[in-house]
Amino acid sequence: MINWDDPLAPISQPAEALHPAANPVLDENQGQATAAQAAPNIDVRPVNPDDKRVINGMTDINQLAPFKYPWAWEYFLNANRNHWTPLDINMAQDVHDYGHSLTLEERHVYENVLSYLTTSDILAMRNIGLAVMEKMSAPELQIYQARQVYEESLHTWTYQHCIETLGLDQGEIYNRYRVVPEINGKIQIANRRLDSVLRADIDLSNRDELHNFLMAYIFFAGIFEGCWFYNGFSPIFALQRRGLMKGTAEQFLHHA
């Protein structure tokens, strides 16, 4: 404990001051020479867009333009022009329809759709953000993929908004993919594909690894998104054609 009445003691010198040879001071010329020797041989030329690659590219990932893939930048701009949120759509009629117009079987189907889509869009978001985007070696592709991650999270918000608006049991709905065999089977297939490309030691310069990555990409784009998602949308659009759950259907139309 410090006692402020104690007499001042002499200050001891630091070890480096006692042994100057162990901590030499370089003069200005010596410092410049040492820095020049340590500096790597850096190519400071601007990026040539022809050298960019979708994956396994060696160009500077921090230089956005000039573009090699201008369509990706256009997709990014168009996606930002088409901004919306689930709160933009009136769900009042859906609350009435769910409580008074849907049969027990129709409610069951509606809930199963939400259960499958909530889990699936989280998987889609993780696939793009964790498995695909970080492997893209052209920045315009990464930027568009980043927007896609946001879109998938927006879709998940949509389903959550429907669940909250209708007052459904969130724990039961979100856990249903573990209980319903048909839903669980699809999720397990997607999980296996995703896990195979999330490994820390994946090497896309290896032909077999690259083939597996492409197969996972095709699966998520063509089957998971292209087929299974639309199978999930179709029961909601069938209800819409009968004048039911039109708010939910309008939400889903923003995804398509």
Where are these regions (language model features)?
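Non-heme di-metal
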Residues: Q93-A256
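Short acidic (Asp/Glu) and glycine-rich catalytic loops that position anionic groups and cofactors
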Residues: A36, D51-I55, G243-G247
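Amphipathic alpha-helical packing elements
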Residues: P40-A92
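Generic surface-pattern signal
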Residues: Q13, Q63, N78-T85, E164, ...
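N-terminal intrinsically disordered, low-complexity tails
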Residues: M1, D5-A36
